[in-house]
From Swiss-Prot:
Domain FAD-binding PCMH-type: 22-196
Protein origin, superkingdom: Eukaryota
Entry annotated with the keyword Flavoprotein: yes
Catalytic reaction annotation: D-arabinono-1,4-lactone + O2 = dehydro-D-arabinono-1,4-lactone + H2O2 + H(+)
Modified residues (Pros-8alpha-FAD histidine): 59
Protein name stated in the entry: D-arabinono-1,4-lactone oxidase
Required cofactor(s): FAD
Subcellular location: Mitochondrion membrane
Pathway in which this enzyme or protein is active: Cofactor biosynthesis; D-erythroascorbate biosynthesis; dehydro-D-arabinono-1,4-lactone from D-arabinose: step 2/2
InterPro entries listed in its UniProt record: ALO_C (IPR007173), FAD-bd_PCMH (IPR016166), FAD-bd_PCMH-like_sf (IPR036318), FAD-bd_PCMH_sub1 (IPR016167), FAD-bd_PCMH_sub2 (IPR016169), FAD_lactone_oxidase-like (IPR010031), Oxid_FAD_bind_N (IPR006094), Sugar_lactone_oxidase (IPR030654)
Top-rank EC class of the record's enzyme: oxidoreductase
One MF annotation (Gene Ontology) recorded for this entry: FAD binding
Amino acid sequence: MSLRNSTTAKRFHSHKTWAGTFWSRPSLYFQPASIEELQAIVTRARDLGKTIMVVGSAHSPSDLTMTSQWLVNLDKLSKAVSFKPHTSGLYTDVTVEAGIRIHQLNEVLKRKGLAMQNLGSISDQSVAGIISTGTHGSSAYHGLVSQQIVSLTIMIASGELLTCSPDENPTLFRAALLSLGKLGIIVYATLRTVPAYTIHSTQHVITFETLIREWDNLWTASEYIRVWWFPYAERCILWRASKSELPLSAPRPSWYGTWLGRLFYETLLWVSVRLWPSLTPSVERFIFSRQYGMEDTLGSGTGSEAVQGSVEGLNMDCLFSQFVNEWGMPLDNGPDVLRALRAKIEAAAKDNIYYVHSPVEVRCSNMSVPDSGDRNVEPNTQEFSASRRGAITGNTLRPLLDINPRDRPYASPHGHVTNSNLTLYINATMYRPFGVNSPVGKWYRDFEGIVAEAGGKPHWAKNFLGPETAELKDNESEDGKMLGLKPIIDEWYGDDLKQWKSLREKYDPTGVFLSGKVWMDRNGLL
């Protein structure tokens, strides 16, 4: 077929990230509606020497998906294919076309009385996207969202479909669980889902000192947990949740969840970014007091409670366009890291060097894996029945490019989990009020220096700078520019990186999926 004249092809398409941080103009844009159409696109690209970039919601705020060649969006490959309930009734394996967005999948599962076991902060991404970028939620009893994946079907550069799982092509499976879209195109995914559930959450205002003092006791007390730190308010929000059979409640009131509150907040941010940077601490303190109040509510019985469906409880409002820079490190290092970040933030504000936005998001995951190589084809349903919390895993294999610490001792999601088993994620968000860039370079340089020293690695899909940040020029055009991980990546990933590169070359020898080659090169992935 002639792709240029095909209804799947579009010229003059402008592609940008959800946050508006980057944009590009691909020569052709495709939205295939069938596997056969997608195969034709891939084989034609190979024959013509073109490269393909695959994109879903474009929620990665980095230039990871920018291309001047062919861009393929999988939104029309969004069908649920099959449902396979386990005899125990504890889980159902669901196969879907991988272009389906998570919010669409949530609705499909809801109609079947099912739910995903764990979610990230949003549900806008595609299934292929959350797998390919290493998306995670926040729980001591769950790992990456891809921990729910039982098997994948990938279209490689020849147009052939390959199935991989813990039992079939397990090394390809490990590479595909965090592929960055460079091995091929995930067309089908089988996910391990569970009966629909509600979660009962409590939310408290705590001081920074309380967070540090209670660190050892916080992270494993509930199935789900997240902390938002507001440095200028010297307060944190502690949110914890567990599965519940209580009746649904009204959602929590939100001051900046209203149209007027949201507009007012974004306007104040715009003023502080464009006109009056030193106003930022006052803005952040004011907004915190309006949204949450300043009183420490932990232990006083005055915190808020809510019972919500799993999706509504685990997702959150990310507010405005933003830069995000998130790193994962051993959770035990958290108190020292946060103290060091606080000192940098306070010193920078005192000397009018830079100002940060809130919240700094603090989360955790259990990405420990068994040393035995147990591939967990059949999860231990008896363990889950006894604990009633944690993941019924689709696999227990570590992605080759997983950012989580390799030295965490293994703890079953249904067993005795301690802080030493866990990864800490710290996410530094900087808003772009009304599309205006906030200066991020100096803050992100300080941030990365501290988290890297603590054994951290950056989330692949976010706005990390890389270890050469000292070479950044202090001018607007270079502010926040990604220099990449090339100087350090071999040390960080070693044999796993070699294996990932070898598989990439094996299944894509002509480089069909090497679109965005500059990004790949600066991060040492070529």
